[in-house]
Amino acid sequence: MPKGKNSSGVVLAVCTAIVCAAVLYSLRYSYLSCSDSVSEFVYGRIYDFGFAFRRTLDFSLQRGRFGLIFPFVVAVRYQLLGSGSPFAFWALQYIPICVNVVLLSFILGRRAGVKCGLLLSLLFASLLQVNGWHSLITCYPLDFMYGLALALTGLCLFIKSTESKKNGLLLKIVSAFLFYESMQTYEAFLTVAAVYLVLSISVLKREGKLSFKNLVISLDAHMITGILFIAMRVFVMFHPIVPLQDGVEDLTRMGNPKDFVITLGAFSGGMFPLADLVHPRVRSRILADGFEIRDIVVSLVAGIGMFMFMKTCRKDEKAAAKVKVIGLCGIVGALCFPLIHSLTSVYQKWVVEGHQFGYVPTTISYFGWIVFITCAVSYLPLSGRTKGKAAPYVAGIVLFTASLLTCGINHALIVEKIGPTSITYSYRTQLFLAAAKDSYCSKEGYDLVYAPDFEGVHDSMMFHEIMLENESETPYDVFLISSPDEYYSTAPSYKNPGVILYDEDSDTAIITDSDEINEGHTVTLSDIRIISAHGGSFSVSYEDNGTTISHEITLKPGEGVTIANEAPVDTASIDVVAR
């Protein structure tokens, strides 16, 4: 290989690595981002492996999923969450995502060249919007990324089965098994059948054997698998094996055609590059706040990577033909994966009435869109359609601009708190966990704790209460309340109430006694505890009889500092500012 081409490949690889690392760094505190993640963390802390396995098995049987491997995977996840390690939380969140990005890059790289594979990773990271609509980027990805890895591996083995004369049948059977196992994780993986159809048609057409009969023979194992999965699900709906819970029948109630189109568009396109620019609040926030220097630098690196790809990728008709098929698979997967959910009335209501701009399938669709975009971009130089000198510069500028706008979008989504599973939810959960581990509440003997800034799990404080009781050095009983009206009516009947407040600007918790209630405000005559989940230097101020009292403190991650106080202080006046 000429030295120039080799060095350009290195530059592309370095650019890809830098952008991916920057994205992962920006998400370093993004875990425990939704109600389900928090509840399963709590379950993992108080229950054993067997409980997790049985709970997941029941969950699966309610939905007609018959398998033991998936419950085992979930039980392992419970145990890792139950370790209480922040690194375990983060690793469970992002290693599965990285595995699938690498797997897709490897597949494309093997078929169309290493640079095409690197480009996929670069585009995935550069254009990733971390929205708050149950995105798998921030919520419980292991189950679904495990399912996606099974589905992708099954597709690869299916192609291998068409190329292998010796082991073709065995590879096809294993592929069908992986197809089945992927559906154990999520019903929506049934739609991967559409991708199998595209691949089968492509192979038969290339071999000059395309006919309905040959198509059926090619897909027989997968057709049987899909029909069997549907039959088991229908059987269980009419003859439950275990008691059905709320939500099990949601996928059986059909909606209407108009709302189906709207829902499919939202669920499929919710993470399409720059899609969140449709939100007026996002656009306004970008215009108001602009872009940070690090975002400009990372976007510039992404643009350089794209420039190097377009400049050095040479014409290759065989590779061009392959990326056409892979790109078609990507767009079919992106459009079809949310199909089942989009047909149902409950999810149509979420979108049409609740204005939800995405759901769990949306992240899988994003993988499909990135495959399609990568293949579309790669096809231009591979097919010899970019002969001009301007093409690399134009492509680099386009990705730089799109990447920079994506950074602005992610900043706006955090600040504006769009969606129920935003990174802000992560920060609050991690902070509450830090407050529980700090043990200040148990040491002070609070029998009632008022936490108005923490929304709990599905509007219930039960799991946060369990967290507060069990994560302290000495477990104890406490009643946790988030409703102001409930607290003000209940507090007088308790001997030692306390409060946990959240300072949004500094991402810190304020814990103190609730000694008095004055005109709807809690007043403390006691010491004030400041806790940070991520550490830093802070200025703490509050009003004492018209005088502003200030303190400068420095905290390590998960650490707290107590500020001595005996004067009556309105807890609403306590302000913490990050320095």
Predicted regions and their residues:
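Transmembrane alpha-helical segments of multipass membrane enzymes and assembly factors
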Residues: 2-3, 103-120, 138-141, 159-164, ...
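Transmembrane alpha-helices and membrane-interface helical segments
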Residues: 102-106, 153-160, 196-201, 226, ...
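Membrane-interface micro-motifs in multi-pass membrane enzymes
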Residues: 67, 116-160, 184-189, 334-376
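Perimembrane helix-loop-helix junctions
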Residues: 191-227, 231, 235
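Membrane-interface transmembrane helices that cradle and orient dolichyl/undecaprenyl
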Residues: 151-171, 206
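Juxtamembrane "helix-exit" motif on the non-cytosolic side of transmembrane helices
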Residues: 28, 77-81, 127-137, 205, ...
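Membrane-interface alpha helices of multi-pass inner-membrane proteins
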Residues: 169-187, 192-193
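Intrinsically disordered, polar/acidic, low-complexity terminal segments
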Residues: 3-117, 211, 219, 236-324, ...
